[in-house]
């Protein structure tokens, strides 16, 4: 019996926002078999949390097949949201315990859908603490935020 072995991919993400809300960007470092690729994009008006989430969505979307992923973020919002809070939100039809709509539900739904395709180990690293890939992502995200080219169509402001 032949068992398909999933590719092992490391993903590092970060989001940045100048003002919050304000111009924002995301940075991604992806590593597969020792080869690194970087991605970034800037948006005219958004929030830091939306950029943190979008970084993870975009990175997972770039994987052409189901993979075993270690995804490292400095955002507790993203890590806790996708591993803990989302289960209750889905049961309550994307409402929080206080019955208010989940903020950034558009991106949570996308992140949930992308996550379903992969086996993901969600990891947290302290930001601005000398973690090589996190620092790379931070620089990519800040540079993108300083040079925005896109509109965040999901941001209500």
Swiss-Prot record:
<dbReference type="InterPro" id="IPR050092">
    <property type="entry name" value="RNase_H"/>
</dbReference>
<protein>
    <recommendedName>
        <fullName>Ribonuclease H</fullName>
        <ecNumber>3.1.26.4</ecNumber>
    </recommendedName>
</protein>
<feature type="binding site">
    <location>
        <position position="74"/>
    </location>
    <ligand>
        <name>Mg(2+) 1</name>
    </ligand>
</feature>
<feature type="binding site">
    <location>
        <position position="14"/>
    </location>
    <ligand>
        <name>Mg(2+) 1</name>
    </ligand>
</feature>
<dbReference type="GO" id="GO:0005737">
    <property type="term" value="C:cytoplasm"/>
</dbReference>
<keyword id="KW-0540">Nuclease</keyword>
<dbReference type="InterPro" id="IPR012337">
    <property type="entry name" value="RNaseH-like_sf"/>
</dbReference>
<comment type="similarity">
    <text>Belongs to the RNase H family.</text>
</comment>
<dbReference type="InterPro" id="IPR002156">
    <property type="entry name" value="RNaseH_domain"/>
</dbReference>
<dbReference type="GO" id="GO:0043137">
    <property type="term" value="P:DNA replication, removal of RNA primer"/>
</dbReference>
<feature type="binding site">
    <location>
        <position position="52"/>
    </location>
    <ligand>
        <name>Mg(2+) 1</name>
    </ligand>
</feature>
<comment type="function">
    <text>Endonuclease that specifically degrades the RNA of RNA-DNA hybrids.</text>
</comment>
<dbReference type="GO" id="GO:0003676">
    <property type="term" value="F:nucleic acid binding"/>
</dbReference>
<keyword id="KW-0963">Cytoplasm</keyword>
<dbReference type="InterPro" id="IPR036397">
    <property type="entry name" value="RNaseH_sf"/>
</dbReference>
<keyword id="KW-0255">Endonuclease</keyword>
<dbReference type="GO" id="GO:0004523">
    <property type="term" value="F:RNA-DNA hybrid ribonuclease activity"/>
</dbReference>
<feature type="binding site">
    <location>
        <position position="138"/>
    </location>
    <ligand>
        <name>Mg(2+) 2</name>
    </ligand>
</feature>
<dbReference type="InterPro" id="IPR022892">
    <property type="entry name" value="RNaseHI"/>
</dbReference>
<dbReference type="GO" id="GO:0000287">
    <property type="term" value="F:magnesium ion binding"/>
</dbReference>
<feature type="domain" description="RNase H type-1">
    <location>
        <begin position="5"/>
        <end position="146"/>
    </location>
</feature>
<keyword id="KW-0378">Hydrolase</keyword>
<dbReference type="Pfam" id="PF00075">
    <property type="entry name" value="RNase_H"/>
</dbReference>
<feature type="binding site">
    <location>
        <position position="14"/>
    </location>
    <ligand>
        <name>Mg(2+) 2</name>
    </ligand>
</feature>
<comment type="subunit">
    <text>Monomer.</text>
</comment>
<keyword id="KW-0479">Metal-binding</keyword>
<keyword id="KW-0460">Magnesium</keyword>
């Amino acid at each position: 019996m032949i068992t398909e072995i999933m590719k092992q991919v490391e993903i590092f993400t970060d989001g940045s926002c100048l003002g919050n809300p304000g111009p924002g960007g995301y940075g991604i470092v992806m590593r597969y078999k020792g080869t690194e690729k970087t991605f970034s994009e800037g948006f005219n008006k958004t929030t830091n949390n939306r950029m943190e989430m979008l970084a993870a969505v975009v990175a997972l979307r770039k994987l052409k097949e189901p993979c075993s992923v270690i995804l490292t973020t400095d955002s507790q919002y993203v890590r806790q949201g996708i591993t803990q809070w989302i289960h209750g939100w889905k049961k309550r039809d994307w409402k929080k315990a206080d019955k208010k709509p989940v903020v950034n539900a558009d991106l949570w739904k996308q992140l949930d859908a992308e996550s379903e395709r992969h086996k993901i180990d969600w990891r947290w690293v302290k930001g601005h603490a000398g973690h090589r890939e996190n620092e790379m992502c931070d620089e990519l995200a800040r540079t993108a935020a300083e040079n925005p080219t896109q509109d965040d169509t999901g941001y209500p402001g």
